Amino acid sequence: MAEEQAYHVNKGLECIKALRARPLDPLVVEEALAAWVETSEGQTLDRMSSDEAEADHQDISKPCFPAAGPGKSSMSRCHDQGLRGSNSCDEELGAFIGDSSMHSTEVQHYHVYDHSGEKVEGVEDADSILVQSGADDGVEVWGGDEESENSDVDSGEPDPEGSAPADWGSSPISPATRASDVETVEGDEIQKLLEDQSRIRKMTKAGKTLVVPPIPSQERPTASEKPIKKGHRREIDLIWNDGRVFIDRWCNPTCSKVTVGTVRAKCICGECPRVCEQCITDSGIENRIWYHNLADIPE
């Protein structure tokens, strides 16, 4: 059953493509419609009673849509309406030919004809094809039962004019659903990573525990805390003159800058002592001391 319906669907698609490539003359279409109405009027009346009973049993209500588009001969499926006859369908068809505003909004039922105006073989199955009118660039086709949708029969060659073949796959996931799924996955992964890191920090290994000292306070020492004294730096100055050496020794605070020459500097940080063990007994701490011979220099 599925293969047969797929065959009819493919045939219907081929007929639609042929009508697009070579549109029929409107006069030919009207003549073919008139001939078809005359021949099918008797069959329609015979099927009205059986179709009405079946519609009441299955609660089926299908609208009577006329055909759409130039060059496509069509006929409303009035036999699905139960009590509605062919005369009302003829009136709707005439009104539809004069009104082209419905071409872009309605889903139409198509009866396919060949170029001679005769109905194509298998049209009773092919007329279940629904085509969205106005969608010339990409025609989407629905029809048949679930088995035909899952069949392996090829839907035909791609349209050389750019029409894409019917897409029988599942509908894509909406962007909102995708964004929600991604956020949930990322949130779960981040939470798991944080838990793993917290567990690793709590685990201690013997002999490899890292003890991090506390960050020292940036507060200044209070008055009760005495500042640490830095100390002194021993300075020596040598002057050569006619074979004689003039030597001067003294102490400068550690915070003072090292310069060339005999310079006795003062403490600028307030943490260096006034005297040290080397200069406490040095008489030259206040005055320059001259040593005229190398032998006179104390060790």
Curated annotation (Swiss-Prot):
Main location: host cell
GO biological process: symbiont-mediated suppression of host cytoplasmic pattern recognition receptor signaling pathway via inhibition of MDA-5 activity; symbiont-mediated suppression of host JAK-STAT cascade via inhibition of host TYK2 activity; symbiont-mediated suppression of host type I interferon-mediated signaling pathway
Domain of life per record: Viruses
Region (Disordered): 56-79, 137-186, 205-229
Record-level Gene Ontology MF annotations: metal ion binding
Family: Belongs to the paramyxoviruses V protein family.
Note: Highly virulent strain of Rinderpest virus can blocks the phosphorylation of host JAK1 kinase, thereby blocking the type II interferon signaling as well.
Subunit structure: Interacts with host IFIH1/MDA5 and DHX58/LGP2. Interacts with host TYK2; this interaction inhibits the type I interferon signaling pathway.
Identification of the protein by name: Non-structural protein V
Protein's organism: Rinderpest virus (strain RBOK) (RDV)
